[in-house]
Amino acid sequence: MSFSPLIRQLIESLRILPGVGQKSAQRMALMLLERDRSGGLKLAQALTAAMEGVGHCRRCRTLSEEELCPQCADPRRDDSLLCVVEGPLDVFAVEQTGYRGRYFVLKGHLSPLDGLGPEAIGIPELEARIRDGAFSEVILATNPTVEGEATAHYIAQLLAGRGLTLSRIAHGVPLGGELELVDGGTLAHALAGRRPIS
């Protein structure tokens, strides 16, 4: 079946979403056009409003509708702690823990094969943020992937010798998890990152 130009454009636009392939995009497009036009229009309006109204916080670079995000605008937060994350979703995840320090949001992780070097992900801006701040500890909360580990290692080397405490988030056995269900790599990290019981 050959789709009209407008339907093809809608399908291709839906394919930019993560995890949405050709067939899923076709189903979504046809469902919106056949069964839920008002929902489709509502989606289009919300998408337009978000694309026009959401930018980046000038201080931490997370997504924000204001010049400063709520975390950066809050004077009660701990100015001595800086948590470095890969993206805005990571800020949301860390916020759920009750963390009360400041953030810096990279634009992903180092990935030379994808052309993502230090400048592309914002390392110079991170250096400026640290230089201009009063931080005593930098928490490297990049993802526990090969690229996330490489990014954390690169940042740690860059910041070494600046009088900062550099820490890495722990990773390993999930709370409530059973050892027999944990993969070998995760268990190895958990054993390497063990801590004494006081």
UniProtKB/Swiss-Prot annotation:
InterPro entries: DNA_Rcmb_RecR (IPR000093), Rcmb_RecR (IPR023627), Rcmb_RecR_Znf (IPR015967), TOPRIM_dom (IPR006171), TOPRIM_RecR (IPR034137)
Domain of life: Bacteria
PROSITE patterns: RECR (PS01300), TOPRIM (PS50880)
Chain ranges of zinc fingers (C4-type): 57-72
GO molecular function, one term: DNA binding
UniProt entry keywords in alphabetical sequence: DNA damage, DNA recombination, DNA repair, Metal-binding, Zinc, Zinc-finger
All copies of domain Toprim, residue ranges: 80-174
Annotated CDD domains: TOPRIM_recR (cd01025)
Transcription regulation found in the keyword field: no
GO biological process per UniProt: DNA recombination; DNA repair
HAMAP family to which the protein is assigned, alphabetical: RecR (MF_00017)
Role summary: May play a role in DNA repair. It seems to be involved in an RecBC-independent recombinational process of DNA repair. It may act with RecF and RecO.
Record family assignment: Belongs to the RecR family.
Protein name, as recorded: Recombination protein RecR
UniProt gene name: recR
